[in-house]
Amino acid sequence: MERNTLSCFISDHEGFNGTIKNSPQDFVVIEIDTNGQFVNSVNTEEEERPCQTTKRIGKLKPSKPDDTDSLIQDCFDLNLILGLSVNRELEHFTNKLKVKPCSDDQEKVELSLGTFPDKHMRAVVHKAVRFNFPFLQTLTNQSEIRVREDPDFQELAGLASEGEAEDFFRFIDAKTPGSVFTFLPDDSKEHRTSVHHFVSRRFGKLVETKSFVDQQKTCITVRLRERGKQAKKRTMADCQMQEESLYTAFTLRKENLETLEAISYMAAVLGVLPSDFTYAGIKDKRAITYQAMVVKKISPERLLEKGSEFERRGMEISRVRPAFEALKLGRLQGNHFELVIRDLKHHGKHGLAELPKVIEEAVENVKNKGFVNYYGPQRFGSGSCVQADQVGLALLKENMEASVKLFFTPEDDDDLQNKAKRHFLHTGNAKESLVLMPAYKARERLMLRALHRYGSGQEGCTRGWLSLPHSMRVFYLHSYCSRVWNQAAKYRLQKLGFKPVQGDLVWAEPVKGLKDATEELSAPQIHVVTSDEEKNEVFSLDQVILPMPGNSVKYPENLLGQWYQDRLAQDGLESCRFRVTPLKLNVPGCYRPLLAKPQNITYSLQTSSSDESNTHCLSLNFDLEASCYATVCLGEIMKTNLS
């Protein structure tokens, strides 16, 4: 089956050819917030309260967050933060500790990382070092930061495994109120008691622990206390959490920049971590985009001070104001698009004189009938040799070594990152490849650092994946499931037609957008179309939903249901549980409408004359719900595969 061909259309208009994204100005994306307002709206009372203007007329509804659209990427690259020479000293220091840990009666060996006069930069160094080396303590003496072995880590590593101890200390350092960490099952009550006592003694003011039984095995969970439930006495930890409760909201305008690239630069300028920024969704690179953001631990005044530095990198900030909490993924109604399609031409049947009529028919068809709600090419990455869904398939099979090889498969280009990938595949030398890998490739560098430390076998590759943020690991699994969904949608329309048929799935009650399979999903919420309902045409095609594979979804009860089983078996996943336990990944699945419709769609056809010829361009504006793709909508309008 062709991987990238989304050629199944639902309208029969002729369509036309044209080019998109000739420049960022031709592709403008404006986020629509949960109140139906553009996030770049201007209000004279902005400093007092959030903007209340520019309500949309259409019927976009808040949709279920699709966390796979968001490639959240924490950047703890010590080469960037400390410098190459200091980081090498630190790695040498940690290697010596691994070989010969300090005993209790030995004097603690320390290493100086240098002086950092800026307190925000000191916070970055503390967090980055502890993330990369959880077994180290970081100490500040005036402006100097020193590191030494953490005896608490060694104690916990003696009670649990070293890997669990690392994950636990990262969990503690993240300081996310209400978050939970679960130790591996432990049948020894005496041993569990020791773990309880350790956590209570060392972190009792921050966390609470309890044991629970899961599949006849007992586990310990640790929950970070909510802020209101912590002891009232102010401690250093309380002060730090109070500082971290400072939030500033703003709108980011960026041009020709990845969302994560923009965040990494802003974090470096402000002296915070990329993980201190939150947003509702990832936006296109080759575009001008406006999106809401919230940054932690930075005041509005400090953010505004850095505005000129951001502008030098193609970013502008506006609507800067205090906020009470971080922004959650999926917290938007959708996106507004202002697009220009250039170099318009017919597919071949008519002359240019007929172009206005052809365009009008195409736009009206999609306005009334919608388009097949395929996942767009952004979902699968930009690679031509290996795409994200292939990595996801290897992870679902728990073939860690194969997944890492796919992850590092280079493109045909000869730039630095592909040279580094090529070197790793040819030599297996993670350390040398790390030196070659550009500093801005944070994911690859995190993976290489872990492979250098733990080796490139099955266990080392597992640790390599665990070095990446959870959202990045699960992205690859969701990419595979999205590929299957796209192919299922094409099969459904080609084999079963353009009307609901017996066995199709619909919502028992009206629901907009994606619905996660774990969100209180009971059987009555999913309705299976009956023979009588098919005969009486009770439902329309835009009510049909298709499951994205997972362990909590119901499959159609017709040919399409069997197709899903055959398709998964084709990839060796006939008994897949859609859980990758070593990587702490779970894919419940979700339900996605087969069709989507643009709202508030307008267009205008323009002609520009030159000495040689007349050229036509189409300006097209519309709104889409979250998780819908403008390029897919354009593909239906133009009758062209833009993937």
From Swiss-Prot:
One of its GO terms (cellular component) is nucleus. Keywords: Isomerase, mRNA processing. GO terms for molecular function: pseudouridine synthase activity; RNA binding. InterPro entries: PsdUridine_synth_cat_dom_sf (IPR020103), PsdUridine_synth_TruD (IPR001656), PsdUridine_synth_TruD_insert (IPR011760), PUS7L_N (IPR056963), R3H_PUS7L (IPR056961), TruD_catalytic (IPR042214). One of its GO terms (biological process) is pseudouridine synthesis. Belongs to the pseudouridine synthase TruD family. Its EC number is 5.4.99.-. Signal peptide: none annotated. The active site is at D284 (nucleophile). Pseudouridine synthase that catalyzes pseudouridylation of mRNAs. Residues 370-597 form the TRUD domain. This is Pseudouridylate synthase PUS7L. It comes from the Eukaryota. It catalyses: a uridine in mRNA = a pseudouridine in mRNA.
